[in-house]
């Protein structure tokens, strides 16, 4: 059933009578307020300017046609993503996806009761044929953050979301604190496409929550292209910014939870 179908929205509306909608970045109760007033200024400060595109001199893009992220992985954005991952907050992943749809593709949202719903942006599919989320890590979280983030994107762009198009050949290995060379080795051959018909001949929009070095997105892209995808562009809510691409043996500490 469609996430934004009337029956599902009614059920979520009833739930919000007991558990009101909260800000995905600071956990403040929002109810029907579209944007958290406490986080608005910091979110604007964390916007990547002048553009969202990732530079190949700072990230490993592999065979990607490109990659983009609207925020730096700092401050309330970092806290919001970590909260979504580690505090059983699947609803927050959808809210993060709304921000991605708005900032990356210009989708406005309207409030349906106390729930924000993304508007379809005419002509903004930008040639993408489908959306594929980076698959879950294999940990017992019960939900996949990139998949839930992709729900508002699919509605805004009017293209199908294929949540099972990519799978893992093995559980995700620990990446936090590892240098780039080891990260790349960890994800080599880690992804597969169970049903190649979903992506064959298609331009894929790959969705993740954070792009750090780009190793994971590049490994996903390799699997998608091997399955017959025409091209892959990666998008994430946030990225770690480096002044220059880190040395292959330089440890990176950006992903450790700090709560």
Per-range role (PLM):
Residues 1-207, 212-259:
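Glycine-rich phosphate/pyrophosphate-handling loop used in enzymes and phosphotransfer proteins
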């Amino acid at each position: 059933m469609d996430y934004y179908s009337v029956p599902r929205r009614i059920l979520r509306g009833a739930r919000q009578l007991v558990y009101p909608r909260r800000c995905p970045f600071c956990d403040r109760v929002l109810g029907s307020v579209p944007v958290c007033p406490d986080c608005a200024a910091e979110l604007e400060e964390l916007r990547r300017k002048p553009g969202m595109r990732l530079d190949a001199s700072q990230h490993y893009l592999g065979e990607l046609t490109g990659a983009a992220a609207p925020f730096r992985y700092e401050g309330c954005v970092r806290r919001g993503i970590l909260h979504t991952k580690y505090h059983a907050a699947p609803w927050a992943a959808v809210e993060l996806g709304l921000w991605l749809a708005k900032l990356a593709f210009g989708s406005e949202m309207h409030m349906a009761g106390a729930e924000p719903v993304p508007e379809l942006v005419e002509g903004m599919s930008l040639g993408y044929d489908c959306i594929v989320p980076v698959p879950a890590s294999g940990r017992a979280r019960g939900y996949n953050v990139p998949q839930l983030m992709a729900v508002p994107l699919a509605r805004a762009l009017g293209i199908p979301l294929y949540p099972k198009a990519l799978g893992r050949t093995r559980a995700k290995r620990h990446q936090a604190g590892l240098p780039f060379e080891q990260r790349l080795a960890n994800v080599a051959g880690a992804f597969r496409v169970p049903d190649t018909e979903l992506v064959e001949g298609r331009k894929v929009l790959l969705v993740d929550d954070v792009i750090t070095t780009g190793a994971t997105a590049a490994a996903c892209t390799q699997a998608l292209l091997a399955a017959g995808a025409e091209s892959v562009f990666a998008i994430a809510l946030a990225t770690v910014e480096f002044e220059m691409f880190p040395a292959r043996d330089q440890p990176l500490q950006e992903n450790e939870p700090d709560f």
